[in-house]
Amino acid sequence: EISSVPWDCRILKDSEEEVVLKACITTLRSPFRLEKEISLKRDESAITIRESLTNLAKEPMELMWGHHPTVGKPFLDSSCRIDTNGTVGFSMDQPDFETQRLKPGTRFAWPAPGNGVDFSNVPGEDADTADMVYITGFPERAWYRVHNETKNISYGMSWDGKLFPYMWM
C-alpha cells in the first residue's frame, strides 16, 4: 500500500558531514503510520535507515512489514555471488515459476539444496530460470551481500534478524 501513495518528506539535516531525510506516511486502507529517517554520513559508503511503525487502531492489528531492495543491470551479472549469515533456504509450497530450479516446498541448508545448484551463484541472463527462494535462520544481526567479482563492487544490507527473520531472494 505505501508504495502507491505520496509520502510526507523533509530534510532534517543538510551539512557537509551528514544528510538526513525524514519520510512519513499514514496508510489509507489500514491504521498504521510509518516513519523513516534515512541518513548518509560523509566518507561512509553505508546508508542508515531507522524506522518506526505505529498501530493507530484501538486493537492489535496484523501486518506484513518488509523491504524490497532490488539490484539489476549493470551491477547484477553471472560474476555475482550472494553471501549471507542466513542458514536455511526454502521455496513456497506452490510453484512460482515454470523454470524454477527448486521443487515446491523444498527446505535446505543454504546455499545448496543438494540438486547440483548453488544458489549463492547468480545465474547468467541466458540461464532461463526464475527462482523464488527465501532465506531464514539468521542470528540477531542478519546480513547479506551481493558481490560482483568482475567489477569488484558489493551491495549489502544488515538488519535485526529477530524483527525481520526472512529474506526474499
What positions do the PLM features span?
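Extended, loop-rich substrate-binding clefts of extracytoplasmic carbohydrate-active enzymes
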Residues: 1-43
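Active-site/ligand-binding surface loops and adjacent short beta/alpha elements
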Residues: 73, 77-160
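Acidic-aromatic substrate-binding/catalytic surfaces of carbohydrate-active enzymes
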Residues: 1, 165-169
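Surface-exposed coil/turn segments at beta-strand junctions on protein surfaces, enriched
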Residues: 14-16, 29, 42, 56, ...
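Acidic (Asp/Glu-rich), glycine- and aromatic
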Residues: 44-84, 158-161, 168
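Hydrophobic residues positioned within well-ordered beta-strands of beta-sheet architectures
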Residues: 21-23, 34-36, 47-49, 65-67, ...
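A generic local secondary-structure boundary/capping motif
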Residues: 11, 37-41, 52, 69-71, ...
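Secondary-structure transition/turn motif
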Residues: 24-29, 52-57, 149-151
